[in-house]
Amino acid sequence: MRKILLAGLIMFLSGVFASAFAQVKIVTPYKDLKVKVLRCAVIEGNCVVDMLFENVGAQDLKIWSSVDFNKAYDDAGNEYNTNYENRIYFYVGDMKNNIPSFNKEINFMSEVPVKVRAELSNISEIATAVSRLEIAFWVVTSLERPTVKISNIPISR
């Protein structure tokens, strides 16, 4: 009986966590770049959004991070950008781009998932979701700044 109750509880909790991210909306400017939100949690006063980026195309995708154009907004009305009070940090794999004007080439190899993290410093205590997260990239040959836009990310505390 305990096993059945435990199995039921696990299935229920799995459904709750899966449904929490079901409302997340993701728009990417690259048709072959798939983005998945893995978790969004507050750690030591900062909101950490862990994601998985995967290039499902046949060719590698080389783009530049454009950290100085990354932005986020929480549902309490706060903006996070490259200022020093409410700052957004950006990580790709083990690379840490935490200097606002630092741009670096990123190679998303075909069929190789890459962990990406956005960290919002000093997240509001009343925020329950990241209303919008904008991760900007930079096309070297033009002035374009294609942006991955993710909306309605629930924050777990």
Place the predicted regions along the sequence by residue.
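Solvent-exposed beta-hairpin/edge-strand motifs
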Residues: 66-87
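Short N-terminal segments immediately surrounding and downstream of signal-peptide cleavage
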Residues: 22-41
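Sec-dependent N-terminal signal peptides
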Residues: 4-16
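Short, well-ordered beta-strand segments enriched in hydrophobic/aromatic residues
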Residues: 47-55
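Detector for glycine-centered tight turns/loop "hinges" at secondary-structure junctions
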Residues: 32, 58, 76-80, 144
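Short, acidic/polar linear motifs in exposed loop/turn regions
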Residues: 57-59, 124
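Surface-exposed edge beta-strand/loop patches
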Residues: 21-28, 64-73, 101-157
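Short beta-strand and strand-turn-strand segments in soluble, beta-rich domains
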Residues: 84-103
